């Protein structure tokens, strides 16, 4: 858990900006039953963190 928190804090601004512009898409992912790991992977790929 601490590792995830450190990761989010270090990537906070980019993650916030991405989420703000893609909130509808993330909501659709959640409604369709996407798992935390899938969403994390999609976000990492979208931001080029992978």
UniProtKB/Swiss-Prot annotation:
It comes from the Bacteria. NCBIfam families: aureocin_A53. It is found in: Secreted. It comes from Staphylococcus pseudintermedius. Highly resistant to proteases. The keyword Ubl conjugation does not apply. Keywords: Antibiotic, Antimicrobial, Bacteriocin, Cytolysis, Formylation, Plasmid, Secreted. The modification N-formylmethionine is found at residue 1. Its main location: secreted. Has bacteriolytic activity against Gram-positive bacteria B.subtilis, L.lactis and M.luteus and several species from genus Staphylococcus including methicillin-resistant S.aureus, with MIC values ranging from 0.11 uM to 7.8 uM. Has no activity against Gram-negative bacteria or fungi. In vitro, has a dose-dependent cytolytic effect on eukaryotic cells. This is Bacteriocin BacSp222. GO terms for biological process: defense response to bacterium; killing of cells of another organism.
């Amino acid at each position: 858990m601490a590792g995830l928190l450190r990761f989010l804090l270090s990537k906070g601004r980019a993650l916030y900006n991405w989420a703000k512009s893609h909130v509808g898409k993330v909501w659709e992912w959640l409604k369709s039953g996407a798992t935390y790991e899938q969403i994390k992977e999609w976000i990492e790929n979208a931001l080029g963190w992978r």
